């Protein structure tokens, strides 16, 4: 009996010691550790087992700061949309390890910049790409989006109506009006006016989802917002274009809607159906789709830059850069602060996501529509917008990814003034 008591006492002591070690590395568990490690002195074997240490699951102490900032635990169901896979991933880290699309997305700004330099330096590199190639190229980009979607993902929109509505209104109301005001304020030449306004009326850019990921924003919201704005662009973009620039240049809204239907809705729907009913096909094509999307983006950017090189490098072309830069900076700022209004007051990740989705639009679609319906010179603003949008958007996302906010930008450049105010 004494041996049993001694063994039980030894086992209890070792168990308590183990619990003490497990909780020592976690400061938030000190009170529980003291409670478990210091039971009252037992008088019998039954009393020794009176307060058996509770086994704590290892996941209780697991923390993932990098995942928590992005909001993966709350949006685990849509996390796989970051990749070109056919189904959900077990963890974001494993998705990043086996998914080439994220690495290619990180290289996209460099590819865009290299495309611009090549098109302006040696126009023959892209001048062979005629407007007949634009629709297939953009269709390849849209197909790469469609295979990332599933029918269940759109059900999330009904569960999150407020942030989705804010982002959608900023995309199709605030941004087009802002584009018209900026174009008129800078006295934009008529050769670029209609194309610039059209660029402000298209759907969100696919790159905004990656920018939301870098900025530790709401990735699921970004993908839903981009998908909804892309699908509805079949109707909304022709209507906005006719209202805002119909008095400047003639716009065939019905023909534009048919073109968007062919190059946007059909490829996206095809990809959605493949991902839903033919996952084996998606598993075959998904490794090459990131490369296809990047190649198509490069063609859609380089062609209008190469064809209109003389106009871009002219005095009028240089005057075009300032309005485009102003527009994108204003769109990022307005998209952020409109989400901070007292009656809308959204969380920081949502504000960042709406900001990048407002400041980044599908300029490749605008370039296609401008080339088909407005003339090749009107595609120049869209091509320039792609370059500026990618550089500014991913720079801002990287800044936010370091844990900083827009309101902290001033203190980064004027640290002494910030220190004086804080003291």
Curated annotation (Swiss-Prot):
Transmembrane region(s): 106-126, 138-158, 165-187, 192-214, 231-251, 254-274, 287-307, 318-338, 380-400
Entry's Gene Ontology cellular component terms: chloroplast envelope; membrane
Protein name: Probable sodium/metabolite cotransporter BASS3, chloroplastic
Biological role: May function as sodium-coupled metabolite transporter across the chloroplast envelope.
PANTHER family: SODIUM-BILE ACID COTRANSPORTER, SODIUM_METABOLITE COTRANSPORTER BASS3, CHLOROPLASTIC-RELATED
Superkingdom of the source species: Eukaryota
Subcellular localization(s) per the UniProt record: Membrane; Plastid, Chloroplast envelope
The organism's taxonomic lineage, starting at the top: Eukaryota, Viridiplantae, Streptophyta, Embryophyta, Tracheophyta
A Pfam family that the UniProt record links to this protein: SBF
Coiled coil: none
Keywords of this entry: Chloroplast, Membrane, Plastid, Transit peptide, Transmembrane, Transmembrane helix, Transport
Membrane topology: Multi-pass membrane protein
Encoding gene (name): BASS3
Record: transit peptide: 1-45
Family: Belongs to the bile acid:sodium symporter (BASS) (TC 2.A.28) family.
């Amino acid at each position: 009996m004494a041996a049993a008591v001694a063994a039980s006492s030894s086992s209890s002591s070792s168990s308590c010691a183990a619990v003490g070690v497990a909780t020592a590395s976690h400061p938030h568990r000190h009170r529980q550790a003291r409670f478990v490690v210091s039971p009252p002195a037992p008088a019998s074997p039954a009393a020794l087992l009176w307060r058996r240490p509770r086994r704590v699951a290892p996941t209780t102490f697991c923390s993932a700061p990098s995942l928590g900032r992005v909001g993966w635990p709350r949006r685990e169901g849509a996390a796989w949309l970051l990749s070109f896979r056919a189904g959900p991933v077990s963890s974001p880290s494993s998705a990043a390890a086996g998914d080439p699309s994220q690495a290619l997305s990180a290289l996209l700004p460099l590819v865009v910049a290299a495309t611009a330099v090549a098109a302006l330096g040696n126009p023959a590199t892209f001048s062979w790409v005629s407007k007949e190639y634009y629709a297939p190229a953009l269709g390849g980009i849209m197909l790469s989006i469609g295979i990332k979607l599933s029918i269940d993902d759109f059900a999330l929109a009904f569960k999150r109506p407020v942030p989705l509505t804010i982002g959608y209104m900023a995309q199709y109301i605030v941004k087009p009006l802002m584009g018209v005001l900026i174009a008129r304020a800078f006295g934009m030449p008529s050769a670029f006016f209609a194309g610039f306004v059209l660029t402000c009326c298209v759907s969100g850019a696919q790159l905004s989802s990656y920018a939301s990921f870098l900025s530790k924003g709401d990735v699921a919201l970004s993908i839903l917002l981009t998908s909804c704005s892309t699908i509805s662009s079949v109707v909304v973009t022709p209507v906005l274009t006719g209202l805002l620039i119909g008095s400047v240049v003639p716009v065939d809204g019905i023909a534009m809607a048919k073109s968007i239907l062919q190059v946007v809705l059909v490829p996206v729907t095809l990809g959605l159906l493949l991902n839903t009913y033919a996952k084996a096909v998606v598993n075959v094509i998904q490794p090459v789709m990131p490369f296809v999307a990047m190649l198509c983006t490069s063609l859609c950017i380089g062609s209008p830059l190469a064809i209109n090189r003389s106009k871009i490098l002219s005095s009028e072309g240089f005057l075009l850069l300032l309005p485009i830069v102003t527009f994108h900076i204003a769109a990022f700022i307005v998209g952020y602060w409109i989400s901070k209004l007292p009656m809308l007051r959204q969380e920081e990740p949502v504000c960042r996501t709406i900001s990048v989705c407002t400041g980044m639009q599908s300029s490749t679609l605008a370039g296609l529509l401008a080339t088909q319906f407005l003339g090749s010179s009107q595609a120049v603003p869209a091509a320039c917008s792609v370059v500026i949008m990618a550089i500014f958007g991913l720079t801002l996302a990287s800044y936010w990814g370091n844990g900083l906010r827009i309101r902290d930008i001033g203190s980064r450049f004027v640290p002494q003034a910030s220190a004086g105010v804080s003291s």
